[in-house]
């Protein structure tokens, strides 16, 4: 592990029904770096992301964030560890506002979203929109945005968690 590595994946293994899909994966990412995973169908890209996101348990190996080993057992544990990712297929709501799409995952339980003041939702969402460089009003209905803009909303949502 290098001194400036923020995310370190060491010797990760994952099998399904006796078939080893991840075979000793190693990766280091410094703070502020952006990486992509490239590979053909069945190469293990999605499996690795699902292990990092807490959707699959790893069979062995270590995940370190900022020098601390983390145990990612579910998606909430991944969020607590500071890991988030966006899917190729957007997980957004066309009929809701941009602010609602960004902030909906930040609430502790379902069914309380309508209790949060719109002004507070918009103020909070505006910070994340600025971070991703999207110049739209938080109250804009998501369905009015282009697909590229919706992807930026998805990134803002992931960052907000």
PLM segments and residue spans:
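Glycine-rich phosphate-binding loops of nucleotide-dependent enzymes
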Residues: 1-161
